[in-house]
């Protein structure tokens, strides 16, 4: 994938979500929620501060993160693959 995000933007690939409940029931429709875990594919250089310096990013390519899936999350198709473009501030945690 040939994409380079700007500023504090992060490109994510959403992880697949489990489609069966713990009891073995297949979940469909609204019961099968989207995962809020994703793999980081690309990271911008950081947020530009008022004094002209750049605040470095905390996430790096390859990290698995948990993110806030709501306003500000942009979905795009790049090279036939659906990716998410978000600000680093919408990332809630890095999974270790």
From Swiss-Prot:
Which Gene3D superfamilies does the protein's record reference?
Answer: GroES chaperonin
Query: Transmembrane stretches, by residue range?
Result: none
Q: Which keywords does the record carry?
A: Chaperone, Cytoplasm
Protein name stated in the entry? Co-chaperonin GroES
Family membership, please give it. Belongs to the GroES chaperonin family.
First and last residue of the signal peptide: none
Taken from the record, one Pfam family name reads Cpn10
Tell me, what is one Gene Ontology molecular-function annotation carried by this entry?
protein-folding chaperone binding
Q: Which GO terms describe its biological process?
A: chaperone cofactor-dependent protein refolding
Q: Mind telling me which NCBIfam families this protein's record contains?
A: PRK00364.1-1 (NF001526)
Top-rank taxon of the source lineage equals Bacteria
Q: What does this protein do?
A: Together with the chaperonin GroEL, plays an essential role in assisting protein folding. The GroEL-GroES system forms a nano-cage that allows encapsulation of the non-native substrate proteins and provides a physical environment optimized to promote and accelerate protein folding. GroES binds to the apical surface of the GroEL ring, thereby capping the opening of the GroEL channel.
Carries keyword Repressor?
no
